[in-house]
Every structure is written in C-alpha cells, then in structure tokens.
C-alpha cells in the first residue's frame, strides 16, 4: 500500500476538523478498498465514525478494513463485508443488514464502487458498456435503495462518487461518462425526493488525483507534465483533497447542501481534461478505419 495515499493522526491534529466530529455515526461504503473510497473512509474513521467496508474481493476488502481500523480508537470500529457485487441488490441489502446488526444503524452512505478502462467507441462491446453502467449507475442505485430504510431513521446523507467525463467529450471514456451522468441525475433526483425526509444526497467528482488507480490506468507516461497546463491550480489533486471534501459534505457545515456535485479537480474541467489526448486522434482514426 502506497503510504502517500493514506492518512494518519495528523489529519486530526493539524487539520480542519475536531477529533470527535463524527462520534456515534456509522458509514456504509461500497468500493471502500479502492484508493479514493478508502481515504474517504479513513477520514471519517479518524473523526470518530464507525464504518462498513463493502467490496467484491475478499482479500482486498479485509486488508482495507484492517488497515483503516488501525486509525480508530476503537479497533472494532471497522467491519469488512466481502463478496458483495453492487449489481446484485440482494447482496447489497444483506450487507446493510450485517452493518446494522454490528453497529445498530447507518448515517452516511458512500456509493463508490466503480469500473473503468480505456476503450474507443468502435471497439467498445455492448457487454463492456453494460458492465460499466451496471457497476457504476445500477450499483449506486442499489446502494442507495438498500440503505434507504436506515437513512430515513437517521436522517442521513448519501455521497455518490462521480467524475467530470460527461461535462464535455472525453475520448475513450464514453462508457464511464454515460454512467456518471446517470449518477449525477440520480443524486439530484434523490435530493428532491428524499429531502422532505431529512436525507441529503450529493456527488463528489474527483479530477486528476495523484497516485491513484484511476490516474495510473487512464493516463500515459507523459500525462502529469502536460496535464498541469490544463489545471488552473497548477497541481494534481491529492487523496487528502478528496478526504477533506468528503468530511465537509457529511459535516454539519454542509447541513443545507443537497443535490450538489462537488467537483474536486483544481478547475481542470473548465479547460478540458488531458485524459486520452496522447492517443487522440491517431488511435481513433486507425480504429475506425480498421472497422470499415
């Protein structure tokens, strides 16, 4: 595990948030073993929250939960729930039951399970497109739906993990752009429908976050240097940037914030991302020509 992507006690002692901010709260996190969702969970746990880490891969899920639990005063504050496919509602529903049995309730939900790869439209199979949409969009729906009963009781908050790929045309990312556009729409709809119940619904849209799985998968070797020219703040994001924004959304400071997409990208999307540009347009032309 790259320690540059993890948090420690300095997040509390040198940060913006008091140590007991989320004392007595419980978070349900899908995709919690991934880099982004893990650091989100670490932040919540460091501030007193208990958490259920939900994932498909048993080893990764259990390792993530074990690592995060070391940050908590209560070493029994993190529950690993593995072998859960968010595309299967019954499996997510069962994970919710296990969480409530362990911790008694759910206050916060992070719907962060996601799938992505680099592929142009000509080579994107219907099954591959469906797979990403099902994991990202259907998985987010299933997560929110399965947690609804508990969120009604706690007047809790949902945070969907989105992106900015659907704000403009991004080559090789049509599948994830379509899925994330749906997530944004779902989050806004839930803000309207669940608001009267006291439930808040928001999205977080990370940009180019350094040392993450997503950046390594989507970016070429020369990406970092060239990408900076497309980021107004002239730096790549850090996992701590995501952690801070997540804490804000769940904190009382955002108690009147719902139906919002919080973009954490240094302003990058306003200039157009550099994702895929190393292959554009030559790779697309070659691909399209080969299909004729």
Curated annotation (Swiss-Prot):
Chain residues that bind NADP(+): 36, 85, 145, 180, 209
Domain of life (superkingdom): Eukaryota
Signal peptide extent: none
Location of the active site: 162 (proton donor), 180 (lowers pka of active site tyr)
Gene3D superfamilies reported for this sequence: NAD(P)-binding Rossmann-like Domain
The reaction(s) this protein catalyses: a (2E,4Z)-dienoyl-CoA + NADPH + H(+) = a 4,5-saturated-(3E)-enoyl-CoA + NADP(+); a (2E,4E)-dienoyl-CoA + NADPH + H(+) = a 4,5-saturated-(3E)-enoyl-CoA + NADP(+)
Triggers of expression: By oleate. Transcription is regulated by the transcription factors PIP2, OAF1 and ADR1. Weakly induced during sporulation in diploid cells.
Function: Auxiliary enzyme of beta-oxidation. Participates in the degradation of unsaturated fatty enoyl-CoA esters having double bonds in both even- and odd-numbered positions in peroxisome. Catalyzes the NADP-dependent reduction of 2,4-dienoyl-CoA to yield trans-3-enoyl-CoA. Dispensable for growth and sporulation on solid acetate and oleate media, but is essential for these processes to occur on petroselineate.
Protein name as annotated: Peroxisomal 2,4-dienoyl-CoA reductase SPS19 [(3E)-enoyl-CoA-producing]
Organism: Saccharomyces cerevisiae (strain ATCC 204508 / S288c)
Record lineage: Eukaryota, Fungi, Dikarya, Ascomycota, Saccharomycotina
């Amino acid at each position: 595990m790259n320690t540059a992507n993890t948090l420690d006690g300095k997040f509390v002692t040198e940060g913006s948030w008091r140590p007991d901010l989320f004392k007595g709260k419980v978070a349900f996190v899908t995709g919690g073993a991934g880099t982004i969702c893990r650091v989100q969970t670490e932040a919540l746990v460091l501030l007193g929250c208990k958490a259920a880490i939900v994932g498909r891969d048993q080893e990764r899920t259990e390792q993530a939960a074990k690592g995060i639990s070391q940050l908590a005063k209560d070493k029994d504050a993190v529950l690993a729930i593995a072998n859960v496919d968010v595309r299967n509602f019954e499996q997510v529903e069962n994970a919710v039951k296990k969480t409530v049995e362990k911790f008694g309730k759910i206050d916060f939900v992070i719907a962060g399970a996601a799938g992505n790869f680099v592929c142009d439209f000509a080579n994107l199979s219907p099954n591959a497109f469906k797979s990403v949409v099902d994991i990202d969009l259907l998985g987010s729906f299933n997560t929110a739906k399965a947690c609804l009963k508990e969120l009604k009781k706690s007047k809790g908050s949902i945070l969907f993990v989105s992106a900015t790929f659907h704000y403009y045309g991004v080559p090789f990312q049509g599948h994830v752009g379509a899925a994330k556009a749906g997530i944004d729409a779902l989050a806004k709809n839930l803000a309207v429908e669940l608001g009267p119940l006291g439930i808040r619904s928001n999205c977080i849209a990370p940009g180019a976050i350094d040392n993450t799985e997503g950046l390594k998968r989507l970016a070429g070797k020369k990406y970092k240097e060239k990408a900076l020219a497309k980021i107004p703040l002239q730096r790549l994001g850090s996992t701590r940037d995501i952690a801070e924004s997540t804490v804000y959304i769940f904190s009382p400071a955002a108690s009147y914030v719902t139906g919002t997409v919080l973009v954490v990208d240094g302003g990058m999307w306003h200039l157009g991302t550099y994702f895929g540009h190393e292959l554009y347009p030559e790779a697309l032309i070659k691909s399209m020509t080969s299909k004729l």
